[in-house]
């Protein structure tokens, strides 16, 4: 089937069993005796191991908590949907007309599940090494800078842990002001430590501004403690 061959080229892997590939790309809404849920289950477990091992080797000084946070920031729906988009999986999945009408081809959940299923199918056919090779190549393309700072989604938590460990206190956040019309309001927030302003940042919401300010504060404080 031409459509599947086109996908295999993007993936960089040609399946020996084309039925297995079609199963991996078949959503449960599609009228078919099989769907990709079982392969998704397998792929999820395999990717958990592959990414966990990758981070374990890449960050030899990271502790268990840091490694868990790093993995959680990559092994999730949003992360796998990003890898699926690199392969344009949405173009090749088999979905029902109702799902088609509901923008199913761009839904992060469908893309993520299909990506996991494809990796599960590759694992069945070629084993762990092939999954490792293909998934890590995609991962490094999607995340050119994989490090402890850039992967932590929750910078406020990371900053709090850092300041408690190094200074014995928790940072505080101060709203400096807001600007712009209601539909495009921007907030400015400062991070303070011992009444000292460490960083300031702006965001479209108070939470976004706090995260951005925490990210900057973390960089500044880490540089001070080097």
From Swiss-Prot:
This is Ribonuclease 3. It catalyses: Endonucleolytic cleavage to 5'-phosphomonoester. Its main location: cytoplasm. Digests double-stranded RNA. Involved in the processing of primary rRNA transcript to yield the immediate precursors to the large and small rRNAs (23S and 16S). Processes some mRNAs, and tRNAs when they are encoded in the rRNA operon. Processes pre-crRNA and tracrRNA of type II CRISPR loci if present in the organism. It holds the Pfam family dsrm. The active site is at 44, 116. Mg(2+) binds at residues 40, 113, 116. Its EC number is 3.1.26.3. Belongs to the ribonuclease III family. Homodimer. GO terms for cellular component: cytoplasm. It comes from Nitratiruptor sp. (strain SB155-2).
């Amino acid at each position: 089937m031409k459509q599947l061959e086109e996908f295999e080229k993007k993936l960089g892997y040609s399946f020996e069993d084309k039925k297995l590939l079609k199963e991996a790309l078949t959503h449960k809404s599609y009228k078919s005796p099989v769907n990709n849920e079982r392969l998704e289950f397998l792929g999820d477990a395999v990717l958990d191991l592959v990414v966990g091992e990758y981070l374990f080797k890449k960050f030899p000084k990271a502790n268990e908590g840091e490694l868990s946070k790093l993995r959680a920031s990559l092994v999730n729906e949003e992360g796998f949907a990003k890898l699926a988009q690199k392969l344009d999986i949405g173009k090749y999945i088999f979905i029902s007309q109702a799902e088609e009408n509901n923008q199913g081809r761009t839904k992060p959940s469908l893309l993520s599940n299909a990506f996991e299923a494809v990796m599960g199918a590759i694992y069945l056919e070629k084993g762990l090494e092939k999954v490792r090779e293909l998934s890590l190549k995609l991962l490094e393309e999607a995340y050119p800078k994989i490090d402890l700072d850039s992967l932590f989604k929750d910078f406020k938590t990371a900053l709090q842990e850092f300041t408690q460990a190094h200074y014995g206190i928790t940072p505080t956040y101060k709203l400096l002001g807001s600007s712009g019309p209601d539909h495009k309001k921007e907030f400015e927030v400062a991070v303070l430590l011992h009444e000292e302003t460490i960083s300031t940042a702006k965001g479209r919401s108070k939470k976004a501004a706090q995260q951005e300010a925490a990210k900057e504060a973390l960089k500044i404080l880490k540089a001070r403690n080097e």
